[in-house]
């Protein structure tokens, strides 16, 4: 698997960094992060592996 996601949090802001295999995985990771209690904002810096 080429998926590697690093998650950082600070005061309700979640930053997603790393690589995923598809645009769908990128969107899914963002949706999961948004669904976590206390999360106010998600910064999605995930790159899709080509």
Residue ranges and their predicted role:
Residues 1-50:
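N-terminal targeting leaders
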């Amino acid at each position: 698997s080429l998926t590697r996601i690093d998650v950082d949090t600070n005061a309700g802001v979640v930053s997603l960094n790393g690589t995923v295999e598809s645009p769908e995985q990128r969107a899914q990771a963002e949706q999961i992060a948004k669904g976590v209690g206390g999360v106010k904002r998600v910064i999605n810096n995930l790159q899709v592996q080509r």
